[in-house]
């Protein structure tokens, strides 16, 4: 697309979605189409639709949603850390990376942060925040972390928008954490417990066993 086309597309785009999203589209339109990148595919489809080029729009195949096997590399995660430094989502990103919990849970921790619920070990600097939040099959009992937390006025949509603006997809942080923990030899059941994937019929004793195991294994990842 020419610069004039990109400007016209952008002005039309902001009528429907946020400025950040439209900026992201324009950035992708400055590069060749990458069929393996969902954002790139989306940007080019939006552009061709806006242009009225239905043939080109149809030609871009959206990948069938199968299992997403992408796991970011350590180098990629380090890049993300550099990107968030000094931004309003830096602490949130660190919490996601340290704990492996979902974005909704990390947002809840920071937006309702209560120091009374945060137990920190002065010897290891590892903290365990009691969240005890269930919805459906999702249960986050504890959030393990290292960074010092503080209450922040952050909402899920605002956080997601800022992270997307930096080209960071929260679900991949979660996948990175799970993969790294398993690589370090942390049992899958403990990884599930740390990430809030605990079955509803769990017995109290087994739950306490998992908490004990989580305390034992988490330092392997925290280091």
Walk through the language-model features, giving the residues of each.
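Non-catalytic DNA-binding core/recognition domains of DNA-processing enzymes
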Residues: 1-56, 100, 171
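Active-site/catalytic core of tyrosine-dependent DNA strand-transfer enzymes
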Residues: 28, 137-177, 182-189
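Flexible interdomain linker/hinge and immediately adjacent N-terminus
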Residues: 49-79, 132-138
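Basic, Lys/Arg- and aromatic-enriched nucleic-acid-binding interface segment
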Residues: 72-103, 170-174
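Alpha-helix N-cap/helix-start motif at helix boundaries, enriched for small hydrophobics
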Residues: 92-93, 104-109, 191
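Short alpha-helical segment immediately N-terminal to, or the first helix within
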Residues: 95-96, 180-181, 194
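Conserved tyrosine-mediated DNA breakage-rejoining catalytic core shared by Y-recombinases
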Residues: 99, 109-149
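Catalytic-site neighborhood detector that most strongly recognizes the C-terminal catalytic loop/helix
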Residues: 195-223
């Amino acid at each position: 697309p020419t610069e004039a086309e990109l400007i016209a597309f952008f002005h039309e785009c902001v009528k429907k979605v946020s400025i950040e999203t439209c900026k992201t589209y324009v950035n992708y339109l400055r590069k060749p189409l990458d069929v393996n990148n969902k954002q790139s595919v989306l940007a080019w489809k939006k552009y061709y639709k806006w242009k009225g080029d239905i043939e080109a729009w149809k030609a871009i195949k959206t990948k069938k949603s199968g299992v997403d096997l992408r796991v970011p590399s350590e180098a990629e995660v380090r890049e993300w850390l550099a990107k968030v430094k000094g931004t309003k989502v830096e602490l949130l990103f660190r919490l996601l990376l340290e704990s492996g919990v979902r974005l909704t849970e990390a947002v809840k921790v920071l937006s309702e942060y209560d120091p009374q619920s945060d137990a920190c070990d002065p010897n290891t600097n590892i903290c365990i925040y009691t969240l005890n939040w269930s919805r459906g099959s999702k249960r986050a009992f504890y959030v393990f972390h290292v960074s010092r937390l503080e209450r922040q006025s952050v909402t899920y949509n605002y956080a997601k928008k800022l992270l997307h603006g930096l080209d960071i997809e929260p679900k991949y942080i979660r996948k990175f954490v799970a993969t790294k923990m398993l690589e370090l030899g942390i049992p899958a059941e403990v990884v599930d417990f740390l990430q809030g994937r605990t079955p509803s019929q769990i017995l109290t004793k087994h739950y306490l066993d998992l908490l004990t195991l989580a305390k034992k294994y988490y330092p392997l990842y925290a280091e």
